């Protein structure tokens, strides 16, 4: 299945964006997010950007105060996911300009729209920034 | 520090779309952003729930307002609270004509609902309508929703339209239609089985996005059925070749790497197709070789591709050259300073070791470094590697290490895994039984509640069977050592239940066997156990049975039994126990104490746990007795079945012992002990082979508290007693009968699978242990890898790779620049161009990671930030100059200065305007949570 979820959580452990590609109940999500954040926060920058958690592997990357965490299956290429995160951040940066946590909070739906373009069924389907952003730009223009 | 840095920093608010949002929304976001604790956040969200509940009921809510409400609902759920009261509004919004609103509606619905939610039915209709829309973005939105919401039942409602859309003129639509089909295939393969040819067709789509997406379903299809897709091998190879030759539009480049994510997917597919297929592997070898040569190992993405190549090579049948290239790549990974790369290297090693077992040897020191690294992730990965390379020569070192690690961690999930690996390795490679028992003790002591119950039975069996054949002396030594180790451990607080069961059993069987420990000493210990774990009935049951054995052995050997006062009170307590099982055991024990030596010996012969018990199901030994009874006028027995003519009832009647009831009623428990009376010592039995019976009873033992649970041991000896408490006709006869001896010894009829196989292995070889607890790495290396290595090796190797690393960094920039001119003319849609070239000069990742370092350290980080502002070109597409200089500015004062060199001039200005706007609305950067404003890429 590849990607099982994508989370953006800040240093205080507050969720800023959550997208799950398999169904989890609210309680499960809450618990999962808490556990993962605790694990990732406990790590330092020299350590691997990968953490095993239950049957997930978490690939995470920190930008300023925000952690991007992607839960993947065991046979996923971790380095590629790490770069996927960066591609996502670059894409958001291209759209928002100097993207920060607040951008994502104020434009939650747009961040989701980008993800919708990039990932479907837990697979990476689009990696061209132009293609990812063009529907969003078109929508912006229409308003 | 962080605050200082951010205070006065300009708000770099989103540059797009203006602020349609209301003050209320801004306030909500602001307060959530500033919440300092989960509790505070919860309070905010809960009051928001109240507000929205009221608002949503208001009449005539303007659409824009409604969209905002929907987003607020998304927030509520994202922060862990129920927003189901508003789902229906999200559903309604999907009906809207306005694209943005519609898409927001779809988004919210996909976030809120799972595919089986009742509301979905209300959306299917909308989806159908939207699939027909002239606006391709509307179609895309509907296809997105399909990928999240359509379940098996609703597939037919949209399938024809989706298939039609596969030929849509817009590539975005084709791509999403393919993914919708992919989703259908996952949900219900049969629903699209006639359509799989479409995936092949779309592979040739002239849009690379569609082609790339098609690889996802193809990967699934090929993993399910490799052989049907062998014809595509050359297509995939040729696509990969074209990608690496930069034939795709430049917009797919990522950090100068052409379409890396597509390359990786292709490599994954090739790994499937080339597995065990020499022909396919040969076709691939060329392009794989090229990749190894071309891939830029100075960037993360280049390494990601290299790693995927290694994986591919470990799956296919590679030629020696490729293997060598893979090994080289791995050694580069391992020599890197980056933990991520080391991790990938260890993983690659684990994969390659299957095909070339020698490869690990040259990296032994690197492996040991990783093993000793404080980074848990790396350590685990290394354990995985060690697990894969375990053999009888290094099993002791590896398992010892694993156990140490197992003891040190708290994560139950992983603890279970590593415990079962230890057990597996120990069972497979144990050099001696003694060692095996030691290892098992440790596993039980520290992870006893996590291991499979079978493991406990294996251990008991091993101790009982010992080395087998002839070496009785060694057997008793082994048992004594087990007993001694348990006596030591037994007083430890809070031992796992399973372990206590093993301990009790072994102490009961062998505690006094050697004569070293007195019966009262052992029985005292057993009472302590029953006492200390009084809530665990299973353990208590084991303890009582062990006591019974101890006393039985004493009585049988003619000694007088002094029941300790604490034992006496334990027995009395259990006689009144609520657990019928414990009660029965206690009564049995009490009864046994009253018997004479000869009877007791027959009931519980010494060291007879391994004897096979033959059960005469037909109870033929009773014939004489029955005959006698009939002759003296008794009525012949008519079975229940015959009497009532009803079949069902029979099973419920214990008298019918010709059939072991398959029901799990209590009767079974009474019957179980029957097979036991084991004979080894005494000698007059008529055995009837009955293997299946044995195994049947063997299994449930452990799992339940039913009295049969202990049958593995007790089954063997309870019968004599049982006749008094069990059903008279049946039990007594068994007891009498089973005194029949035969050459039952040694013939093992146990069919309990896991047990047999494992217990036999460790027996086979006893190798002298090498001393391996040497702290020095090379020693460790030698014991792990069997090779020799010295300190100097270590130094030279680490000395060797540092400079290498340095050069790698430098060279990193060079080839990139060389590459740029070679690139084909930029394709349309490439926005990233202008800055991309500047970024080539540096590895953006190194920079970024440096930044992350600095921002994470609290002390003095502002200075570090200052330093970094010189080395600013961080991202490819956006200049981060501005951010960084802003950062350093802000640390000095609150004033803002324009940075002329920012490539984002207009944006900064825009941001400034927005800043003012936001300030007006009350969002103030000086507030509690300044990191909110921090640029992510900065």
UniProtKB/Swiss-Prot annotation, chain A:
Predominant place of localization: Golgi
Keyword Membrane tagged: yes
SUPFAM superfamilies: SNARE-like
Pfam families per UniProt: Clat_adaptor_s (PF01217)
InterPro entries named among the record's database cross-references: AP_complex_ssu, AP_mu_sigma_su, Longin-like_dom_sf
Keyword Plastid recorded: no
GO BP, sorted A to Z: protein transport
Any one GO cellular component localisation term in the record: AP-4 adaptor complex
Cellular compartment(s): Golgi apparatus, trans-Golgi network; Membrane, Coated pit
UniProt keyword annotations, A-Z: Coated pit, Golgi apparatus, Membrane, Protein transport, Transport
PANTHER family: ADAPTOR COMPLEXES SMALL SUBUNIT FAMILY (PTHR11753)
Family: Belongs to the adaptor complexes small subunit family.
Assembly, per entry: Adaptor protein complex 4 (AP-4) is a heterotetramer composed of two large adaptins (epsilon-type subunit and beta-type subunit), a medium adaptin (mu-type subunit) and a small adaptin (sigma-type subunit). Interacts with EHD2.
Role description: Subunit of novel type of clathrin- or non-clathrin-associated protein coat involved in targeting proteins from the trans-Golgi network (TGN) to the endosomal-lysosomal system.
Record-given protein name: AP-4 complex subunit sigma
Organism: Arabidopsis thaliana (Mouse-ear cress)
UniProtKB/Swiss-Prot annotation, chain B:
Ranges: HEAT repeats: 118-153, 154-190, 192-227, 234-272, 321-358, 359-395, 397-431, 454-495, 517-556, 562-601, 874-911
Positions with biased composition (Polar residues): 694-706, 808-821, 892-906
Signal sequence annotation: none
Ranges for region Disordered: 690-712, 725-867, 880-912, 919-938
Keywords assigned: Coated pit, Golgi apparatus, Membrane, Protein transport, Repeat, Transport
Subcellular compartments: Golgi apparatus, trans-Golgi network; Membrane, Coated pit
Coiled coil: none
InterPro entries: Adaptor_Complx_Large_Subunit, AP4_complex_esu, ARM-like, ARM-type_fold, Clathrin/coatomer_adapt-like_N
Residue ranges with Basic and acidic residues bias: 764-779
GO biological process: intracellular protein transport; vesicle-mediated transport
Major localization class: Golgi
Record keyword Transport present: yes
GO annotations of cellular component type: AP-4 adaptor complex; clathrin-coated pit; Golgi apparatus; plasmodesma
Positions with biased composition (Low complexity): 728-744, 853-863, 880-891
Entry's family note: Belongs to the adaptor complexes large subunit family.
Quaternary structure (record): Adaptor protein complex 4 (AP-4) is a heterotetramer composed of two large adaptins (epsilon-type subunit and beta-type subunit), a medium adaptin (mu-type subunit) and a small adaptin (sigma-type subunit).
Function of the molecule: Subunit of novel type of clathrin- or non-clathrin-associated protein coat involved in targeting proteins from the trans-Golgi network (TGN) to the endosomal-lysosomal system.
Protein name: AP-4 complex subunit epsilon
Origin species: Arabidopsis thaliana
């Amino acid at each position: 299945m590849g990607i099982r979820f994508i989370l953006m959580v800040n240093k205080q452990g507050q969720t800023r964006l959550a997208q799950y590609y398999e169904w989890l109940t609210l309680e499960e999500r809450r618990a999962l997010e808490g556990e993962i954040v605790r694990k990732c926060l406990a790590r330092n920058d020299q350590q691997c950007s990968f953490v095993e958690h239950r049957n997930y592997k978490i690939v995470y990357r920190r930008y300023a105060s925000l952690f991007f965490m992607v839960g993947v299956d065991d046979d996923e290429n971790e380095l590629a996911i790490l770069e996927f995160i960066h591609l996502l951040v670059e894409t958001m940066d291209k759209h928002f300009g100097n993207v920060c946590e607040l951008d994502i909070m104020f434009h939650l739906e747009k961040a989701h729209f980008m993800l919708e373009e990039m990932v479907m069924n837990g697979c990476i389907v689009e990696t061209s920034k132009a293609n990812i952003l063009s529907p969003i730009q078109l929508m912006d223009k229409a308003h | 520090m962080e605050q200082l840095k951010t205070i006065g920093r300009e708000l770099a608010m989103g540059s797009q779309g203006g602020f349609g949002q209301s003050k209320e929304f801004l306030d909500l976001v602001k307060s959530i952003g500033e919440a300092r604790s989960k509790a505070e956040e919860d309070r905010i969200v809960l009051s928001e729930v109240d507000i929205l509940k009221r608002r949503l009921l208001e009449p005539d809510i303007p659409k824009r307002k409604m969209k905002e409400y929907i987003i607020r609902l998304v927030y509520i759920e994202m922060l862990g609270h129920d927003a189901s009261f508003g789902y229906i509004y999200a559903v309604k919004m999907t009906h809207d004509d306005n694209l943005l609103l519609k898409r927001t509606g779809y988004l919210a619905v996909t976030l809120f609902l799972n595919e089986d939610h009742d509301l979905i039915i209300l959306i299917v209709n909308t989806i159908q309508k939207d699939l027909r829309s002239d606006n391709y973005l509307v179609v895309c939105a509907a296809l997105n929703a399909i990928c999240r919401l359509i379940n098996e039942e609703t597939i037919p409602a949209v399938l024809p339209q989706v298939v039609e859309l596969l030929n849509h003129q817009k590539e975005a639509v084709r791509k999403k239609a393919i993914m919708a089909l992919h989703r259908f295939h996952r949900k219900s393969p049969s629903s699209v089985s006639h359509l799989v040819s479409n995936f092949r067709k779309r592979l040739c789509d002239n849009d690379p996005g569609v082609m790339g997406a098609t690889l996802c379903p193809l990967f699934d299809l090929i993993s399910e059925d490799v052989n049907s897709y062998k014809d595509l091998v050359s297509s995939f190879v040729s696509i990969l070749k074209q990608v690496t030759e930069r034939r795709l539009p430049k917009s797919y480049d990522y950090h100068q790497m052409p379409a890396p994510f597509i390359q990786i997917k292709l490599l994954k597919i090739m790994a499937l197709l080339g597995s065990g297929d020499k022909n396919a592997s040969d076709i691939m070898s060329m392009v794989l070789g090229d990749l190894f040569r071309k891939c830029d190992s100075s960037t993360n993405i280049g390494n990601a591709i290299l790693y995927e190549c290694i994986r591919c090579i470990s799956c296919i049948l590679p030629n020696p050259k490729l293997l060598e290239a893979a090994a080289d790549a791995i050694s580069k990974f391992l020599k890197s300073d980056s933990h991520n790369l080391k991790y990938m290297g260890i993983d690659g090693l684990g994969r390659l070791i299957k095909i070339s077992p020698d490869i690990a040897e040259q990296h032994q020191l690197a492996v040991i470094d990783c093993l000793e690294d404080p980074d848990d992730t790396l350590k685990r990965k290394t354990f995985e590697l060690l697990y894969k390379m375990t053999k009888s020569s290094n099993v002791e070192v590896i398992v010892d290490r694993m156990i140490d690690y197992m003891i040190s961690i708290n994560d139950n999930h992983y603890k279970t895994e590593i415990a079962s690996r230890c057990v597996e390795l120990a069972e497979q490679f144990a050099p001696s039984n003694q060692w095996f028992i030691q290892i098992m003790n440790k596993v039980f002591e520290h992870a006893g509640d996590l291991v499979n119950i079978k493991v406990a039975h294996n251990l008991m069996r091993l101790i009982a069977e010992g080395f087998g054949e002839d070496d009785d002396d060694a057997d008793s030594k082994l048992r004594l050592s087990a007993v001694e180790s348990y006596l030591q451990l037994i007083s430890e607080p809070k031992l796992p239940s399973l372990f206590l069961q093993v301990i009790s059993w072994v102490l009961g069987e062998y505690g006094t066997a050697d004569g070293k420990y007195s019966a009262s000493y052992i029985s005292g210990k057993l009472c302590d156990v029953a006492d200390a774990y009084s809530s665990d009935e299973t353990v208590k049951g084991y303890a009582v049975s062990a006591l019974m054995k101890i006393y039985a052995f004493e009585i049988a050997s003619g000694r007088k039994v002094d029941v300790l006062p604490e034992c006496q009170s334990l027995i009395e307590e259990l006689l009144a126990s609520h657990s019928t099982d414990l009660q029965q055991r206690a009564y049995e024990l009490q009864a046994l104490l009253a018997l004479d030596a000869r009877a007791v010996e027959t009931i519980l012969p010494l060291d007879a746990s391994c004897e096979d018990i033959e059960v005469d199901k037909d109870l033929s030994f009773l014939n004489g007795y029955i005959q006698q009874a009939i002759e003296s006028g008794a009525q012949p027995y008519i079975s229940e079945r015959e009497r009532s003519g009803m079949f069902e009832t029979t099973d419920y009647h214990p008298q019918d012992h010709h059939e072991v009831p398959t029901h799990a009623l209590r009767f079974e428990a009474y019957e179980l002990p029957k097979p036991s009376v084991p004979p080894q010592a005494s000698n007059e039995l008529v055995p009837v082979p009955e293997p299946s019976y044995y195994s049947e009873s063997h299994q449930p033992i452990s799992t339940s508290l039913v009295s049969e649970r202990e049958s593995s041991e007790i089954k063997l000896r309870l019968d004599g007693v049982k006749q008094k408490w069990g059903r008279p006709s049946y039990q007594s006869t068994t007891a009498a009968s089973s005194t029949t001896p035969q050459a039952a010894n040694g013939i093992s009829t146990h069919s309990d699978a896991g047990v047999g196989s494992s217990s036999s292995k460790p027996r086979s070889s006893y190798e002298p242990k090498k001393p391996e607890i040497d702290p020095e790495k090379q020693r460790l290396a030698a014991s792990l890898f069997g090779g020799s290595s010295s300190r100097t090796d270590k130094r030279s190797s680490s000395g060797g790779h540092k400079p290498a690393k340095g050069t790698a960094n430098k060279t990193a920039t060079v080839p990139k620049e060389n590459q740029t001119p070679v690139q084909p003319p930029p394709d349309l849609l490439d926005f990233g161009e202008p800055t991309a070239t500047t970024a080539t000069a540096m590895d953006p990742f190194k920079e970024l990671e440096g930044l992350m370092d600095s921002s994470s350290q609290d002390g003095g980080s502002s200075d570090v930030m200052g330093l970094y502002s010189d080395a600013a070109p961080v991202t490819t597409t956006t200049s981060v100059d501005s951010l960084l200089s802003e950062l350093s500015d802000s640390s000095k004062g609150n004033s803002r200065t324009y940075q002329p060199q920012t490539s984002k001039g207009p944006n900064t200005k825009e941001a400034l305007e927005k800043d003012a706007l936001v300030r007006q609305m009350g969002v103030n950067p000086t507030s509690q949570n300044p990191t909110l404003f921090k640029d992510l890429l900065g």
